[in-house]
């Protein structure tokens, strides 16, 4: 049975996220990369199939400077974000990643994760970089397009931010 819930980004959760990421991002190998950025007070919305994590969505509070850099197209590679840009609390959020295991795609799981996020945090100023056509298509349902940076990369922001 598929369930979606919010969980803290503990080491255990980050190790599960890393396993999913390795399917798509083989260059992110070390758990220390995750631990340097995410803290237990950060959270993820995870999709579980009979208790096994099969997908996740992470959006974390960030400094306004990072939020603005994303919106302006200055920051387009989140691997290089200084971990000091992530905060414990902020009105600005950066949607770091949404990943669903290949075998579970096409079941609207990404939408369930984003529905859960926006149900809990309807007023957060959230930005993201869509780096694939699938990501772009998904983002269009929940965010407003700020700008296309290239054929595959686009900046989106929560609708309340772009169209107050």
Predicted feature locations:
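Conserved acyl-donor/pantetheine-binding loop and adjacent beta-alpha core of acyl/acetyltransferases
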Residues: 58-97
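Conserved beta strand-loop-helix elements of the APE1-like EEP
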Residues: 156-161
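Short amphipathic alpha-helix that is part of the acyltransferase structural core
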Residues: 1-35, 39-54, 58-63
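Short beta-strand micro-motifs in enzyme catalytic cores
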Residues: 43-45, 91, 152-155
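Conserved beta-strand-loop-alpha-helix junction that forms the acyl-donor binding cleft
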Residues: 98-105, 127-155
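Conserved acyl-CoA
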Residues: 84-88, 112-126
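Conserved GNAT acetyl-CoA-binding A-motif
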Residues: 92-95, 119-133
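Conserved acetyl-CoA-binding loop-helix of GNAT-fold acetyltransferases
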Residues: 97-100, 105-119
